[in-house]
Amino acid sequence: MDISIKVTYKNEGLQKLRKAAGLSQSQLAALAGIKVQVLQQYERGARDVNGAKLPTLLKICNALECRLADIITDEETLELLKKYEEH
């Protein structure tokens, strides 16, 4: 699978998670402490969510009631998260 396709799929998942949580982009951006434009870029795949700072990712996950693995696309990071969750 092409990595750009994988990143786009995960970013689309971010949008689906946000909508399932009943949050607008501006609401989620405020909860995560980021600009609406940044969230829009994550959702479109124009900005890689893997480049976000951990506190920002945790705020996004907290607001969406999801795990980091639900929004992270980097395979190495996902493997580390899986190992951490196993312990």
Residue ranges: model-predicted function:
Residues 1-20:
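A short, Lys/Arg-rich alpha-helix, primarily the initiator
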Residues 19, 30, 62:
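Alpha-helical residues within the helix-turn-helix
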Residues 54-70:
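DNA major-groove recognition helix of helix-turn-helix/homeodomain DNA-binding modules
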Residues 2-4, 72-87:
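Short, charged recognition helix plus adjacent turn
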Residues 24, 35-38, 53, 67:
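Short coil turns linking two alpha-helices in DNA-binding domains
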